[in-house]
Amino acid sequence: MKNTLFALGLTAVSATVAADPKSCSSLLDLDVRRLAGDETVNLCEAYQGQVILIVNTASKCGFTPQYEGLEALYRKYRDRGFVVLGFPSNDFANQDPGSEEEIQKFCRLTYSVEFPMFEKVGVKKGRAAPLFERLAAAGAPYPKWNFYKYLIDRNGNLVDHYISTTGPESAKVVKAIEKLLSFQDSK
């Protein structure tokens, strides 16, 4: 009887630890630099417990207007624990050739971007930044173009990914975000 109770107690503790959004996911446990600045942020420490949409961005792409939809999602859901994290990249057809300062200015002036933006990075296989290497190791493809999106749950697990043609305000993306937010809201 004691062994059974001990095993049940151990199982309950293990389940609690596994579901604890405060524990750091290896996917997000890395430091990145804010766009056009010197401040370094540990993604796990800064965003653990939140639903995250990671996006590789570009300023001169046919999909660049998606900044508007990304910002709209961020503003709509941020108070419920949702954040968009943008990572500019010049890996595709030289569509983000500017300096980080130019990219930051473009995002703010053209699309009023308030969601966190980080350093310009490589995203292609073989030269991808550590975050994109980890996303690939978690089962997502490397971006094949600008504005690939990666949805991460509150525990830091990759839930889904979306190609460039799937807009941030598409029913598919919104439904997935709302499901993750509602799951936590119902606890």
Model-inferred region functions:
Residues P130-E133, A137-K187:
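Thiol-/selenol-based redox modules, centered on thioredoxin-like
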Residues I52-V55, L85:
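Conserved hydrophobic packing residues within short motifs/helices of P-loop NTPase cores
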Residues M1-T4:
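Positively charged n-region of N-terminal signal peptides that target proteins for export
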Residues N56-K60:
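Amphipathic alpha-helical repeat scaffolds
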Residues A19-S25:
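Cleaved targeting-peptide boundary
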Residues L30-V51, Y74-Y77:
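A short beta-strand-turn-helix
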